[in-house]
Design a protein with these regions (language model features):
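Catalytic core of non-heme Fe(II) oxygenases with the double-stranded beta-helix
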Residues: 1-106
Length: 106
């Protein structure tokens, strides 16, 4: 296990469903690794996954290309390579969004 983190974001009315937080990878100095996101409760504020990886050397705020969006549903888990850029979004309709993030070597 490299890292376990619980992240809770709260409702914001000035955020848009079309926007997302800054794309990132979790732990740059431990590549390669896997990430598992576990959604603690139902919410909105999708997780956004990009086609881009760390090796693409892109400008994240202008060049990132969205691959898919995953909605937080209680008990849902998403497993992916740790070098894939991803981002969360603050909830708009729900009061909170809680995710447990596991980064680990396989």
């Amino acid at each position: 296990m490299i890292r376990v983190r619980i992240r809770r974001t709260f409702q914001t009315k000035n955020h848009s469903r079309e926007k997302y937080n800054v794309p990132h990878i979790d732990v740059k100095d431990h590549l390669p690794y896997k990430t598992l996101l576990y959604y603690v409760d139902d919410s909105d504020g999708d997780s956004v996954f990009f086609k881009n990886t760390v090796s693409d050397n892109i400008l994240l705020d202008t060049d990132a290309v969205i691959d898919k969006k995953i909605s937080p549903k209680k008990g849902r888990a998403v497993y992916f390579d740790g070098d894939i850029y991803h981002s969360g979004n603050c909830p708009i309709d729900f009061n909170k969004r809680t995710v447990i993030n596991f980064d680990f070597k396989v």
